[in-house]
């Protein structure tokens, strides 16, 4: 125990430097040198938050950081230390209940984490020690240990692959538990250790690994291994993410591997990813905090008023010191200011229940339990991936009903990301794969169907480029889980585009046969096998927007093949070759196809020696490796020869257009942020109806700006011109703007990445902010915006700009790829698509769904219902507590401001915990104030709740005045009834506690029946909790007043409730007061039902007369209480 603690404490020492050195097998390099074991953390995984010793203090500290909990703690301490009118139990017991329930919930969740940690930490692993396999517990693995992992086992820590049972030193891994990707990934051993396949040979290895310090990026690793043999100098090889096996990943289709541990325990990438995303706060939470401040002010005002009036009332000697209650000498000598302060605190305690202590717990339970409805929704289930929706955080359920802006990726989100090779052009000549029917069978018309033929050698060169320049892997069907291509093998790649291009080349006679021992094998049109030595791969990245390979032919020629976006390739090829291809690229983009340009160049041997040295040096760098590689790549990929371009079709997702239309009808602004070229993205936007045929497009692109020599001057002119046009067309208010979308000319904006950079980073003094301001004004007036050629960080920049607009609009981002993660994390709500580009977006999102079409129901139905439910819950909590405390306040005017409580301590304690908590919880989980089909069919209903409509000042005042009216009725109704002696048969008048019990009975029944009136969607659960709560109150009152409790000093409630109900007059009084309290609500229901029926009849007559289809009119929800939609009346 002490050693583990010491290890964890000392583990930070090695973080002082930028890299760490690992001795493979924990062997010294030279037998003559002493070996000192390094201090790294052990392999224990600790995902739990608490221990047995720190649970109580740590949990209490976290809970009392909440304003309401801390407030009630202060009230409790005041009750304990000051002579207050109520027992400390009245505030202490509810607080204890809330704290205990939360602690039990969090403790149970942490216990589950402890149990899961122990299962991992105690699992058996095999370590190579002294040329033998030694069985150990996983937590005992140390950095430098060589670990043996067998098929279908999970890697116990982050390992560098040394060797595998395959001859080429590869292994296949699935990382579903890390990033959700179920497809196999290939990892590679260093070529110098491939042959070390036995425990003896592994134990004889002397090597060191230098690598970066632990960091959470799953897809980044920088290191190098130095292997020492009989020679004096070590052989150094670079290490990258393809050599690293991550903890939590599973070995597949490989019998056995050996790897050396480089990161263990809490320093593994999986453990570093445990940390949660930045906390997002919903609009409802902000409203709750604002309401708490308002009610705290009301509480302070009540206490101040009562304290002041008490001393005004006591200014009369008879009132201050009556003959039957003379003050003691000590009371007379007490400092007056201290007495006033003590009285103020006493009134604070008396009225403290105006702040709902249990609301936070109820809100948490509502969010947690409510999130299951999304996961259980069968409409979100996708048979293709056999998965449904997933909720990664339940804190933002209601935020789904408040979205103003939707930012969506294009590829894989609006489109299927299922690529098909359509056509290509070679040296400006168009080639298209055509088919013809022969005896009912479809077959390709020759290897290449062409419209104008290029040189035969150029055709072959182009197709060879498609077969060589990619990261596709060929696997036999036995090595692959899932669907196969046929013919005994399948293609696997992280990019569907590359698979489509390789398949396209295969269709036209050139077949990629895989990569064996560093040689790429290609079968040409003559069925001959060609082999190319793969010298270097210059991987694709979103900044360069291209990738390259350097290969050596069988004749010894060294060639570079490069493919990428036209904007990336054209500046790097000879200018006279561009025009031949550019027209085809633009035409294909207009047709909605994804285009890539292909280029090559021959590298002289002398140049290659220099290039090779630069690449090796950059790959071996441990610091700034990416920047150094990028610099070398930039130098290599110049002066190329353009061969041609490809066109790949990415079909629109099912119901993508309908979803866009529904979001538009709901008043949401949809922006498409994509890295594709403008023409392709523009075509997709028309196809998915983001742009309508009558939409006037405003362009801020490189093409429109380059018409002038001074780009910034031209940009300024366009911005001013567009702003004038839009301000003249549309009114200023946002609300009228949404109506104007259907009444006036619609405008759409197109902007590309370079123009956005010019707007944000203008060289003119102070013009950048001015450009940004004008640009945002234009965007706000457009119904749709297309941002093309966007880098990932630019996507996040745009989301951040909109978030910071005046009014703080709620933003939602949806995407499927790693390049969408930045905008998903930046927006208020992040949605990940479980797509074909991995699961990085889904893993970093708040919610994940299989398809873009599911966004419609997620927002229009679930978002709408969640918001209405929790908004009603919040308003109801403050309403019922104001109803509860107002009679207590009014009672002080009739008891000389003596701080006499109106209710018994048991009622004060149980009101929020037992009598009124379950009905509102059931309502907030199950209520459907509008039918789900109606919400789906009429997206305009969504507009009625946006802008946090139900928690604005209007609804807040409505609920507050309603509570004030009902609280006044409770008190004065009972007060005036007490003026007569007819309540008892013997003429006796009820006392103080009977008076308070009648008020409390009317209160409990009224606030519960108010919720029953508000309920439209009745289930057996609603019936059970509503009528059950009322029955429990009656039962408890009989039980509490029917027994003499020995632990109570005073038996003031003994037989009060039973005697009270023996009077028929009391029964009638209670029923009458409940009816008077609810009468305005009932009257509102009747009036609005009549108006609704009248509106329906008029609508039916209008439909019959003019035969026009129209959606039902929608009543504003700003002041709704939902009682008008009750099924009771």
UniProtKB/Swiss-Prot annotation:
Cofactor needs: Mg(2+)
Active site: 409
Cytoplasmic side: 1-83, 309-343, 898-905, 974-988, 1045-1066
EC number of the protein: 7.6.2.1
Motif annotated as Di-leucine motif, chain positions: 1113-1118
Enzyme class, first EC level, given as a word: translocase
Residues that bind Mg(2+): 409, 411, 816, 820
Short name of any one Pfam family annotated for the protein: PhoLip_ATPase_C
Residue intervals passing through the bilayer: 84-104, 288-308, 344-364, 877-897, 906-926, 953-973, 989-1009, 1024-1044, 1067-1087
Coiled-coil annotated residue ranges, if any: 607-643, 695-726
CDD domains from the UniProt entry: P-type_ATPase_APLT_Dnf-like
Record-annotated site: Cleavage: 439-440, 445-446, 481-482
Keyword hit for Iron: no
Residue spans, topological domain Extracellular: 105-287, 365-876, 927-952, 1010-1023, 1088-1129
Catalytic activity: ATP + H2O + phospholipidSide 1 = ADP + phosphate + phospholipidSide 2; a 1,2-diacyl-sn-glycero-3-phospho-L-serine(out) + ATP + H2O = a 1,2-diacyl-sn-glycero-3-phospho-L-serine(in) + ADP + phosphate + H(+); a 1,2-diacyl-sn-glycero-3-phosphoethanolamine(out) + ATP + H2O = a 1,2-diacyl-sn-glycero-3-phosphoethanolamine(in) + ADP + phosphate + H(+)
GO molecular function: ATP binding; ATP hydrolysis activity; magnesium ion binding; phosphatidylserine floppase activity
Subcellular location: Cell membrane; Endoplasmic reticulum membrane; Early endosome membrane; Recycling endosome membrane
One GO term of the biological process aspect: positive regulation of B cell differentiation
Membrane topology (UniProt): Multi-pass membrane protein
Processing after translation: Proteolytically cleaved by CASP3, CASP6 and CASP7. Phosphorylated at Ser-1113 likely by PRKCA; this creates a functional di-leucine motif that is sufficient for endocytosis.
Record family assignment: Belongs to the cation transport ATPase (P-type) (TC 3.A.3) family. Type IV subfamily.
Domain notes: The di-leucine motif is required for sorting to clathrin-coated endosomes upon ca(2+)-dependent PRKCA activation.
Associated pathology: Mice defective in Atp11c show defective B lymphopoiesis, specifically in mature bone marrow, pronounced stomatocytosis associated with anemia, hyperbilirubinemia linked to mild cholestasis and hepatocellular carcinoma.
Protein name: Phospholipid-transporting ATPase 11C
Source species of the chain: Mus musculus (Mouse)
Gene: Atp11c
């Amino acid at each position: 125990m002490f050693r583990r603690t010491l290890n964890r404490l000392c583990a930070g020492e090695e973080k002082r430097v930028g890299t760490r050195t690992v001795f493979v097998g924990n062997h010294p390099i030279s037998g003559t040198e002493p070996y000192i074991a390094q201090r790294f953390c052990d392999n224990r995984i600790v995902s739990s938050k608490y221990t047995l010793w720190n649970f109580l203090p740590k949990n209490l500290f976290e809970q009392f950081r909440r304003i309401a909990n801390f407030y009630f703690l202060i009230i409790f301490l005041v009750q304990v230390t000051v002579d207050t009118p109520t027992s400390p139990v009245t505030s202490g017991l509810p607080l204890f209940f809330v704290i205990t329930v939360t602690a039990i919930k969090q403790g149970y969740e942490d216990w589950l984490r402890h149990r899961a940690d122990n299962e991992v930490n105690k699992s058996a692993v095999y370590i190579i020690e002294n040329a033998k396999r030694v069985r150990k517990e996983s937590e005992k693995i140390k950095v430098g240990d060589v670990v043996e992992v067998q098929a279908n086992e999970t890697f116990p820590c982050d390992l560098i692959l040394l060797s595998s049972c395959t001859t080429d030193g590869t292994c296949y891994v699935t990382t579903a538990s890390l990033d959700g990707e179920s497809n196999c990934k290939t990892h590679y051993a260093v070529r110098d250790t491939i042959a070390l396949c036995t425990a003896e040979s592994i134990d004889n290895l002397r090597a060191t690994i230098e690598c970066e310090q632990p960091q959470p990026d799953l897809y980044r690793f920088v290191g190098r291994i130095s292997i020492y043999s009989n020679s004096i100098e070590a052989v150094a090889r670079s290490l990258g993410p393809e050599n690293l096996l991550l903890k939590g990943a599973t070995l597949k289709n490989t019998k056995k591997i050996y790897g050396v541990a480089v990161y263990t325990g809490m320093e593994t990438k999986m453990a570093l990813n445990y940390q949660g995303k930045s906390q997002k706060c919903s609009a409802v939470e902000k409203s709750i905090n604002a309401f708490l401040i308002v009610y705290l002010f009301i509480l302070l005002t009540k206490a101040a008023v009562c304290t002041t009036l008490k001393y005004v009332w006591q200014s009369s000697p008879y009132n201050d010191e009556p003959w039957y209650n003379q003050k003691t000498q000590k009371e007379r000598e007490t400092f007056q200011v201290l007495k006033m302060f003590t009285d103020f605190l006493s009134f604070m305690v008396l009225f403290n229940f105006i702040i709902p202590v249990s609301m936070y717990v109820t809100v948490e339970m509502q969010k947690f339990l409510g999130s299951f409805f999304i996961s259980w929704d069968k409409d979100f289930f996708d048979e293709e991936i056999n998965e449904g929706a997933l909720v990664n955080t339940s804190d933002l359920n209601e935020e789904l009903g408040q979205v103003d802006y939707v930012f969506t990726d294009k590829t894989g989100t609006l489109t299927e990301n299922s690529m098909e090779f359509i056509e290509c052009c070679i040296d400006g000549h168009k080639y298209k794969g055509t088919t013809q029917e022969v005896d009912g069978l479809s077959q390709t018309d020759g290897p290449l169907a062409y419209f104008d033929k290029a040189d035969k050698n150029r055709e072959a060169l182009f197709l060879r480029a498609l077969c060589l320049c990619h990261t596709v892997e060929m696997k036999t069907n036995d090595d692959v889980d899932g669907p196969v291509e046929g013919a005994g093998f399948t293609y696997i790649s992280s990019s569907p585009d590359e698979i489509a291009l390789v398949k396209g080349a295969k269709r036209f006679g050139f077949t990629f046969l895989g990569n064996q021992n560093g040689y790429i094998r290609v079968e040409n049109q003559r069925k001959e096998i060609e082999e190319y030595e793969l010298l270097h791969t210059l991987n694709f990245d979103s900044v360069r927007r291209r990738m390259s390979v350097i290969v050596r032919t069988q004749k010894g020629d060294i060639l570079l093949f490069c493919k990428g976006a036209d904007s990336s390739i054209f500046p790097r090829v000879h200018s006279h070759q561009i025009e031949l291809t550019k027209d085809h690229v633009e035409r294909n983009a207009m047709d909605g196809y994804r285009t890539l340009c292909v280029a090559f160049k021959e590298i002289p041997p002398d140049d290659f020696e220099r290039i090779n040295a630069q690449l090796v040096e950059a790959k071996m760098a441990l610091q700034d490796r990416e920047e150094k590689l990028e610099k070398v790549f930039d130098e290599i990929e110049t002066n190329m020869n353009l061969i041609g371009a490809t066109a790949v079709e990415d079909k629109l997702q099912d119901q993508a257009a309908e979803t866009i239309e529904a979001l538009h009808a709901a008043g949401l602004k949809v922006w498409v942020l994509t890295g594709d070229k403008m023409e392709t993205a523009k075509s997709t936007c028309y196809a998915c109806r983001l742009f309508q045929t009558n939409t006037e497009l405003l362009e801020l692109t490189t093409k429109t700006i380059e018409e002038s020599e001074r780009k910034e001057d031209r940009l300024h002119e366009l911005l001013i011109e567009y702003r004038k046009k839009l301000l003249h067309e549309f009114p200023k208010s946002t609300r009228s703007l949404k109506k104007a979308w259907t009444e006036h000319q619609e405008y759409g904006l197109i902007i590309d990445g370079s123009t956005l950079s010019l707007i944000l980073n203008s060289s003119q003094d102070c013009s950048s902010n001015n450009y940004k301001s004008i640009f945002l004004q234009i965007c706000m007036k457009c119904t749709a915006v297309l941002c093309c050629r966007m880098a990932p960080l630019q996507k996040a920049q745009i989301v951040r700009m909109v978030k910071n607009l005046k009014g703080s609009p709620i933003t939602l981002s949806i995407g499927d790829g790693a390049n969408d993660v930045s905008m998903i994390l930046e927006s208020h709500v992040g949605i990940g698509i479980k797509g074909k580009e991995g699961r990085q977006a889904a893993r970093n999102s708040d919610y994940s769904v299989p398809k873009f079409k599911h966004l419609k129901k997620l927002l229009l139905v679930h978002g709408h219902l969640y918001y209405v439910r929790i908004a009603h819950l919040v308003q109801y909590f403050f309403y019922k507590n104001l109803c509860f405390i107002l009679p207590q306040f009014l009672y002080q005017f009739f008891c000389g401001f003596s701080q006499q409580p109106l209710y018994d301590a048991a009622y004060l304690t149980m009101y929020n915990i037992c009598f009124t908590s379950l009905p509102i919880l059931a309502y907030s989980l199950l209520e459907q104030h509008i039918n789900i089909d109606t919400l789906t069919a009429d997206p305009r209903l969504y507009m009625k709740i946006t802008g946090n409509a139900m928690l604005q000042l209007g609804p807040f005042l409505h609920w507050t005045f309603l509570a004030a009216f009902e609280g006044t009725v409770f008190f004065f109704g009972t007060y005036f009834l007490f003026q007569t002696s007819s309540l008892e048969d013997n003429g006796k008048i009820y006392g103080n506690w009977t008076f308070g019990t009648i008020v409390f009975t009317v209160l409990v029944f009224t606030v519960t029946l108010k919720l029953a009136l508000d309920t439209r969607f009745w289930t057996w659960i609603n019936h059970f909790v509503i009528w059950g709560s009322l029955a429990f109150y009656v039962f408890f009152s009989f039980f509490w007043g029917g027994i003499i409790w020995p632990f109570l000093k005073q038996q003031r409630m003994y037989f009060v409730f039973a005697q009270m109900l023996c009077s028929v007059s009391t029964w009638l009084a209670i029923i009458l007061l409940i009816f008077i309290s609810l009468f305005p609500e009932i009257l509102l229901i009747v009036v609005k039902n009549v108006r609704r029926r009248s509106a329906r009849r008029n609508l039916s007559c209008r439909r019959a007369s003019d035969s026009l289809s129209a959606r039902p009119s929608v009543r504003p929800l700003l002041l709704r209480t939902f009682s008008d939609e009750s099924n009771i009346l």
